[in-house]
Amino acid sequence: MSSKSGGAKKKAGDGRKIIADNRKARFNYSIGETFEAGIELKGSEVKSLRTGQGSLNEAYAQVTRTGEVMLVNAYIPIYLQANQFNHETRRPRKLLLHKREIEKLAAAVQRQGMTVVPLRMYFTDKGRVKVEIGLAQGKKLADKRETLKERSWERDKARLMREKG
């Protein structure tokens, strides 16, 4: 009957427990196609993520020459109870994708100059950690300003509706 405090942040509508959400990526990039990838983690990393900590800020994914996709610069804090068996906080982690998906990502990055960015990290119903990655094109400064204007207008519109209604 007791619930654990400090766990994963929130539960999405489809039963996912979201660990980390990269909100800056949606602002700085226009996201095209998205993929769901598994991630190769050590035990202490999974334990640390279960506490709801972790960050995808400044993280990116890259396709290596050997045909693997690596998640670089994602922050998973150390797990205090793991003491000597702990992990590095910002080590490169392998993302698990199908071969066709990897080829598609590599082609888009090479030919179209796109970037692969992690959008969110979450636990599935089965307790597996997944990372949602997206093919992204960098936004220009004018596009970012337009996004800010739209958000501001939506906020003002909602405020006006509350005052009138």
Swiss-Prot record:
GO biological process, one term: trans-translation
GO terms of molecular function: RNA binding
Presence of keyword Cytoplasm: yes
Domain of life: Bacteria
GO CC terms, sorted: cytosol
Predominant subcellular localization, coarse grouping: cytoplasm
GTP-binding among keywords: no
UniProt keyword terms in alphabetical order: Cytoplasm, RNA-binding
Function (record text): Required for rescue of stalled ribosomes mediated by trans-translation. Binds to transfer-messenger RNA (tmRNA), required for stable association of tmRNA with ribosomes. tmRNA and SmpB together mimic tRNA shape, replacing the anticodon stem-loop with SmpB. tmRNA is encoded by the ssrA gene; the 2 termini fold to resemble tRNA(Ala) and it encodes a 'tag peptide', a short internal open reading frame. During trans-translation Ala-aminoacylated tmRNA acts like a tRNA, entering the A-site of stalled ribosomes, displacing the stalled mRNA.
Protein family membership: Belongs to the SmpB family.
Designated name of the protein: SsrA-binding protein
